[in-house]
Amino acid sequence: MADACCTRTYVIAASTMSVCSSDVGHVSRVSSPSTCTGSSWQVDNCQESCCEPRSCASSCCTPSCCAPAPCLALVCAPVSCEPSPCQSGCTDSCTPSCCQQSSCQPACCTSSPCQQACCVPVCCKSNCCKPVCCVSICSGASSPCCQQSSCQSACCTFSPCQQACCVPICCKPICCVPVCSGASSLCCQKSSCQPACCTTSCCRPSSSVSLLCRPVCRPACCVPVPSCCVPASSCQPSCCHPASCLSFLCRPACSRLAC
């Protein structure tokens, strides 16, 4: 349709607004063609429904309907498009990646950059500590040979969680002292920390000293040889009596008779 204030004729829709050309360059007033007083007016092509989002072009989130901004100098800039919460059709950056649950922490994931109400935590890496079970070297319920270390026979304490995986605490039982097996000539039983059985004569069990597995074997006291004893005469020593074992030497203490 035509307007008397304009030199040119334009055909516009009924819902179309116009901006007078004299107001272009500053904040334009929205007017109808009949109110334009300048030499010409231009058709405003702004949409009256929802503006096509320009700043909300993310493929992840579906923008909510943007209200049209006032038409300034033929520019239809939508009001700031606030994205709605992420829909199911979001891209990978916003879609929850299946969180593989670890054995020791069911839901210990960290949130993705697209967090808050938008996304579910992304797949988490398990930095869990797994207990390292200690196997006792003792066999049999009656064997008193083994003393457990601080980690005990059930399970070791958790080591601090590392980045890649857990460094197990080395659980080595403290070596124990061989136990004598009665009157057997090979009286020392093997200890797991000693490759061969004790070769010394009848060993008495002793307490474990640090991590060394060395029995303190005390030899039996000296027994006098039959030829050792001579009838008491001419100041000869009487029959030797065994002395108590001092250190590892067993020296007989022979008493002297008066001449």
From Swiss-Prot:
Coiled-coil portions: none
GO molecular function: identical protein binding
Residues of the signal peptide: none
Tissues/organs with expression: Restricted to a narrow region of the hair fiber cuticle, lying approximately 20 cell layers above the apex of the dermal papilla of the hair root; not detected in any other tissues.
Record keywords: Keratin, Repeat
Domain of life: Eukaryota
Assembly and interaction partners: Interacts with hair keratins.
Function in brief: In the hair cortex, hair keratin intermediate filaments are embedded in an interfilamentous matrix, consisting of hair keratin-associated proteins (KRTAP), which are essential for the formation of a rigid and resistant hair shaft through their extensive disulfide bond cross-linking with abundant cysteine residues of hair keratins. The matrix proteins include the high-sulfur and high-glycine-tyrosine keratins.
Protein name: Keratin-associated protein 10-8
Organism: Homo sapiens (Human)
